[in-house]
Regions:
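Short, structured patches in soluble enzyme cores that scaffold and shape functional sites
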Residues: 89, 116, 133, 166-169
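A residue-level signal for conserved active-site and pocket-lining positions in enzyme catalytic cores
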Residues: 28, 61, 85, 130, ...
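Surface-exposed, charge/polar-rich loops and edge strands
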Residues: 2-23, 30-34, 120-129, 137-142, ...
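Charged helix-capping and loop-helix junction motifs
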Residues: 76, 145-150
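Generic detector of intrinsically disordered, low-complexity, polar/charged segments
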Residues: 58, 107, 141-145, 161
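Short glycine-rich anion-binding loops that position phosphate/pyrophosphate groups of nucleotides
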Residues: 64-67, 134-138
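N-terminal active-site beta-alpha-beta segment that forms phosphate/nucleotide-binding
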Residues: 2-124
């Protein structure tokens, strides 16, 4: 769990930034492939101990890819505590939208091999976003998959708490960043 506050954004030339991020994405993906995939339960315990959430906070999770930390045990624990949950819905070039979800709900296929709540589920505005990542730096800037979905979403939601879920090796001193990149909390 990474908790950092927003810092000033410093830009790099676009071509160099794209190249640096692409190289780092590959390194991080390769490293993450070799990690244990049973981090969900310890993550849930650590999060519940460390992150104070209002009783009525709406929490957004994500449906994990095979090499990502699995947030489902945490989402199940939050649901048991009475929190409303939602998962992201992806539309190319737009901020994420969020639809209500419970651990018993069936998901449908979304873009980019994602899983998302069905279109008949109500939209929700999360107070806390659990965010997947490939790497995160000491200022809270994350390296995602390159689509900019979470950056656009964090910029729009503004006051929502952004919490990155990562293995320790995914933390680094400073990542390349552009003016559009938004840090996690």
């Amino acid at each position: 769990v990474v908790l950092e506050r927003q810092r000033s954004m410093r830009s790099r030339p676009p071509d160099r930034l794209v190249e640096e991020k692409a190289r780092l994405r590959q390194v991080c993906r390769d490293e993450r492939q070799h990690r244990a995939h049973d981090a969900g339960a310890p993550l849930a315990a650590a999060f519940l101990d460390a992150i104070p959430l209002a009783a009525d906070a709406v929490v957004s999770g994500y449906w994990p890819f095979p090499d990502e930390i699995d947030p489902r045990p945490l989402l199940t624990a939050l649901h048991a505590r009475g929190h409303a949950l939602c998962l992201p819905v992806t539309a190319v070039g737009a901020p994420l939208r969020f639809r209500a979800w419970t651990p018993c709900d069936v998901l449908v296929s979304g873009p980019f091999d994602t899983r998302e709540p069905a279109s008949n589920k109500p939209e929700q505005r999360p107070d806390c976003l659990l965010v997947p990542l490939l790497a995160v730096d000491d200022d809270g800037y994350r390296l995602g998959y390159g689509g900019g979905f979470y950056d656009r979403t964090l910029a729009v939601l503004g006051d929502a708490l952004g919490v990155g879920l990562a293995f320790g090796f995914q933390r680094c001193g400073r990542l390349p960043r552009g003016a559009h990149d938004c840090p996690l909390d």
